[in-house]
Amino acid sequence: MTDIESALAHRLENHQIPHMEFPTTRASVHTLENGLTVLLDPDPQAPVISTQAWVETGSIHEGRFLGAGISHLLEHMVFKGTERYDGQAISDTVQAAGGEWNAYTTFDRTVYYIDGPAESVETFLSVLTEMVFKPSFPAEEFEKEKNVIRREIDMGMDDPDDRNGRLLYSTAYSIDARSQPVIGHMDLFNQLTREDMQKYHRERYTTENTF
């Protein structure tokens, strides 16, 4: 062992690793009569809230649509309107209540969230409930949103990191649904219809599948 290595070993041996402090949680789990699971984790010191809806629906659940990216397409279309709000009204309602919103789709889940002042919790929950369980899927927005995603797919194919990621997952999970990209393959994506999406929503976006 060299002098440098000896000195480094000595320093590491005597280095005190600080104890990590984790905040205590008051989280509780409740199941409603309709099967919806509700998780509450209050923090009275923070006057803000994060309202979220986690749907157990991602690319690995797509079954006959595997590789088409229907979960991701559905995530986009949910923002386009509900039985109660049109797309602009959703945005205006959230912003007027001081909220910021977004969503994402992964292999095993789709998550929608609105963050903002705690006093707006009822508004946020109302909007989230409408979006997740009562989307209207306006026909005039369907092809528009498909074109948005087509551009996303093209951009991904032009990105070396994205292509490497696809290659990694397709190799590591060659016999698993994770081998398929969440956003989908262009040829399969192009075949998706509005009716496909509506049926997929009815099958997957249930209260028992959401928390």
Where are the regions a protein language model picked out?
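Short loop/turn motifs at secondary-structure junctions and domain boundaries
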Residues: H19-F22
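Active/ligand-binding-proximal structured segments within catalytic/core domains
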Residues: G35, D43-V94, L168
